[in-house]
């Protein structure tokens, strides 16, 4: 409509040029924008329709040290700045890098407002702590609060207080106000900037920067003289080789200008444009800027590279250690500052494995007299000839042999060569990423339509690759201008290309040093690292399988091992398939995988075998080395109760023999229940590896992988858009997460992290709504990431436990504290000595020393045995398993013992853990006294004894503590009470003093509202010494009930009197009276002394005095007072009444008794 103009204001990221300056007259941080950029981002401010504070958030590009958006105040636009430019003035963390700063671009976004910070934590050194711990108001003024609008950023170093901003809440960046809580903490090391002062402290900042810059320039020209003799090294410069984790973009102009000479007049140069935008980026290498001077070249130069194994005095040699003398590469300098290592050359993994993964290489500049500064403009074609014809063969693998994937990987191969002028050499491997899901979808769609392969689409979306189709250059021909390099340029318009034949070779090994899978976008798999701990190593099962794979594919082994491995686990989602995939990549082995449920045909065994052969025969015949992996193998052959042979299992055994007869073939199968597998098939596997639930250290490594993987996948920033990405907040502790997630599987840990991200998004949205700020501004305030906090992860873990605890059997930590246990101080000290020592100092038990992990509580009922066991789990942050006797019994033979094994296996999976056997006398009575004909109870006791022996060992059982409780220890099997099992017996009796009784009531009534007149000591003095802890619990509960009844009666009387004053139709209900009339006194329940007296008079003790005497006699029998006889050889008898333990030993016909005195010394007659 006329008179209305539409504006398109840009608020998303804009790529701009960045310069950094320092103002000696004004030390405040600020940003200046060029006029055009200011009008683009702040059009409403530029035309005067809006005024006030303007802010931008900028992420500097090219350096890993600046991977987050930082917010700055924007001053007026500067007309002197070049177009599309940002001037960052006095940015302290950048200026400290001085001459090492080469970042010149970044993404800029508009920020409308920042939130006020609630909390700021500042770390300072101990020597300045007293100075920094000033009043709250002074700290706010120093940091720039109170309407100064100074942006406080987490991670910045503040020179005014010599401290580092360690944490900001609720966002990483914001403004201070008078209500902001500032916390100053002491830190021994702050990782402060290194260029604030010189090492000896004698130079100021400007002199230090000037000296470093002059030294760098003089050092470069001393090594890079224009004298041809000094310009070129004869043997090359050695560098260690490292591989890049992901591709690095290099800024390339479409036309590069170089200098050439006219053939008629060589003295008159002319400019020649050469296109280098489409050259092969796989020949790009990177190093730190300081390393270029050692080589004698500039960033972007073409240099020669050869293996460092050669020790010849000349670079261009012809020795046997260098079959290929050298290769041409283009060297680039990393953007400074960076965290890359000095003395290293960084190659892409594809170039590295095609060079056989050299550890050391030598670089040498190209010798072209009088043209030293022209090499940046040279194309590879100046040194590498054009190939006339090239032949490429498929590498035989499960991917290239799959017809459903053929169309896609051939299309991707064509796209690969059309994207630029590639440089190849003979026997070079070419990786082509493939999205298998996309390829199979296209194939199935067009196959249903009856379309030929030739009519399949030629333009296919890129997709997300999850597999690699390998190709190998078998033949390349052309004029070798430089026979030493054996490199050829492939021009899709001039080079004749042929794809024919299939070759057999192993894929490159994928390792942390050369992670080509992650570089090609297939994702980074968990590597199952074998990290040595105090007592055990992590992922021992991965170490075992890794050894088996390497031994099977070892070409030097003359005997075919015919290796077969069964992977089993008691829980699902442990990571069996991931383990096989990861180790296949790591060891450089082809992998073919089938699912037992997919190939199973219940109606026909022959069809099942036919389907398996159709999927495996061709692959096994053409691929080597190879892992044949069948998951869910229990679907094919389950154990049968009938005593007959499983014909399908026999046929599968024949298949296994046939496949493993070929050298280099490994057969691996996985199952969730190995006991349910057919006996015939299970016996075929030579190795059986059991995967357990991750330990605490293993969970730490898994959490680290999950969180680091998110951080390594840097969000993609483009003009106007930015992908949402997540990152952990600085105070997230991996060790705390792993401790809270005991007993959970790797898939549960993945779910926890994903759910924490969802909770973080919800939290940021609610914060944005509360502060009236847009969601995008909240994200920019946290560095461009959504930061998930420890609270988010803790909520996610609790949600996972509550949702899946029944299905996965994950135990929960009870919420019983020491304050809930009254008295029993001596017992608490004994428990601390038994459990606290192995938990805090496990290294003391690493050499096989037996640890005391069994505790037996015995005594009258109601004395707090179960409560004390739960307090142990809570106090030491241990998981808690409670086992009742009847749940272990099963009518089938052998199942009861299996239940005992499963209990202890779950405890080992969830360690640190407490296994609590309540009423132990019903679970493990004396053997031989039971009336059951099958001897079930005897076998349960025997199994329990064997498991307890495993718990007390120095290996495997660490972190598992067994606690038993019984009222009748005299009924227990005597073998349970020997050292190494329940070797710590603690008697829990009734309180023998009124002081102890008072402590019990204090613990039970600590959440009560007691009347000021209540004195628990007086209440305790009126109680007999026959009251147990359960009796006192009943006493306090009845007292609370009496108080509630009294208050309720009083309220009823008040309501009755209130209604008497009202007409009958207007009388009110109890609910209305509480909502409108009731006072605080009517709601507050105060327990008075009369309530306790009434409860005590009505209470009947649960244990009589006679019964207590009986328990005391039982205690006397177990802890001392019972005389032991020792028969010596001379017939004399000695008596020992010190309560020592005696072990009877028989030598032939003569009985000898071994006695153990109080000091642990052995006395043998």
Curated annotation (Swiss-Prot):
Enzyme class, broadest EC rank: hydrolase
An annotated Gene Ontology molecular function: ATP binding
Keywords: ATP-binding, Hydrolase, Membrane, Nucleotide-binding, Peroxisome biogenesis
Catalytic reaction annotation: ATP + H2O = ADP + phosphate + H(+)
Classification via PANTHER family: AAA-FAMILY ATPASE, PEROXISOMAL ATPASE PEX6
UniProt record similarity statement: Belongs to the AAA ATPase family.
Name listed for the protein in its UniProt record: Peroxisomal ATPase PEX6
